[in-house]
Amino acid sequence: MKKIFLAFLLITAMMTFAQQDNFEISKSLSIYNNVFRELNMNYVDEIDASELNTVAIDAMLDQLDPYTVFIKESEIEDYRMMTTGEYGGIGAIIRLEGDYVHISEPYEGFPAHKAGLIAGDKILSINGIDTKGKNTQEVSELLKGQAGTTLEIVVSRYGEKNPITKTLTREKVKIDNIPYYGVFDNNIGYIALGQFTKNAATELKTAFIEMKQQTDLKGLVIDLRGNGGGLLKEAVDIVNIFVPKDKLVVYTKGKNVQQNSQHRTEFEPVDTEIPLVILVNGGSASASEIVAGSIQDFDRGVILGQRTFGKGLVQNILQMSYNTQIKVTVAKYYIPSNRCIQEIDYSKNKKKTTDSIAADTLGQRFTTANGRVVYEGHGIKPDVEVKIDQMSILTIMLYNKDMFAKFADKFFYEHKKIASADKFAIDDKLYQEFIDFVKEQGFTYTNESERILSELKKTVKREGNETMLSDEIDLMEKELANAKADDFNKSRKDIVEMLRMEIVSRYYFQKGKIVTSFTDDEELHEAFNVILDTERYNEILGRNK
């Protein structure tokens, strides 16, 4: 009798909470409807009801997390492209420079490339529409369209006096999941995985098998740096290439039990023994973290680089009225050690900022298959951490002001061909040419020391100490000017790397940029060291116990 009574109390309590929730929802909707109606009837100026409604919805969703968003009808195609990696267009990356959008990088083999458009081309008009003052999103919408349709584009080009007119036929553009793969001289394979759209796992599997057939691979490096994620199924299937069938890779848990699911490996693996290193950094998120975290939890490979982003949330896209959608966070995902890698608890952290306290002191401890300790939350901590020096202010400002791109445009006009991507180098003469070019462009920048000194001068003046400290401040300004004159020497390594990639991309496109980046890639070289040192590799994975 007591059990029946307790059950009755529990059911009654649940019904009461449900009724309260329903009342609050009805109340809120009624208030919103009344406010909207009164604004429409009484506000002094005409209001755009659709725009006002979108702003209200966005403000509401902003209280939750960055991934729960309202998708307007005009944005649906962009979200479809994020899933499939396909869109109808000309196949080019664009960038804003001044008042005009420029071609930043045409995709090799697609309409922009086939029509002869090159990096640096300034887009003047599209189908007769002047593009001056338009942003990249607006220009992108003009360039995109159904495959098979044509467009006329007018561009100006460095070194050409007159505008150039091109007629292009749009195609279905497929952004490569794998922009590059290949085998190095040390017989270590490398696969750069840029995203997890449809068929990513199949493409990676095909590339891996092809390399295995070409040579006796000593190991494999999968590069997930900067990969923000994508389809969960593709992540699971990629793990499946390296671990046995029927292994639990990830499971999800949400408020509604319908969102709870388990995702296991379904096929026989390709190779469960080859030494494996996964490269990650702060831009590796979501599906990338499922792959890296699962490989780490299974002790199947070594994770190398910097701590990952920490996105352990699952979203579903739900259909709404009037051809709109809402992408909703419905669950958290957990990897084989049972840890969740989510960095921020958005229910408690409305500012959506990370905590500065050391991550390992906060997260719950879990263990891998071999008993290694790993921690929950805060992304995936690499087994081998490689610290990357922060890029200098000078290099950042040169990039932000398009100095690398502008010089590359000039260089491409003056040089019809260069050495192969892996052999092209920036020598002293070319580096000085770049410095001279930058000065001719009137480039200026303020470094951190100058900014602090400027603030100090304001404070000294405000406090009436200007006369007393003027000599000291003048001396500091002279010393800083002398030090700044040497900035191009101090930042040479970063500048050379950026400049080389920009120039190489004009001749060898995206693959060339990747190949030329290998020269200075400390993480890749450390990955080679780990793979080639069998004892170290096994020790990292806890296999020597």
Name what the model sees in each region.
Residues 340-341, 345-347, 351-545:
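Conserved functional hotspot residues or short segments at active or partner-binding sites
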Residues 18-28, 32-49, 72, 102-106, ...:
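Cleft-lining beta-strand/loop regions that shape enzyme active-site pockets
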Residues 126-127, 377:
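Residue-level recognition of conserved beta-strand edge/terminus positions
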Residues 120-122:
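Structural motif
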Residues 105, 134, 167, 329, ...:
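Short linear motifs in exposed loops
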Residues 43-104, 148-170, 175-180, 518-528, ...:
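Extended, small/polar residue-biased N-terminal targeting/export presequences
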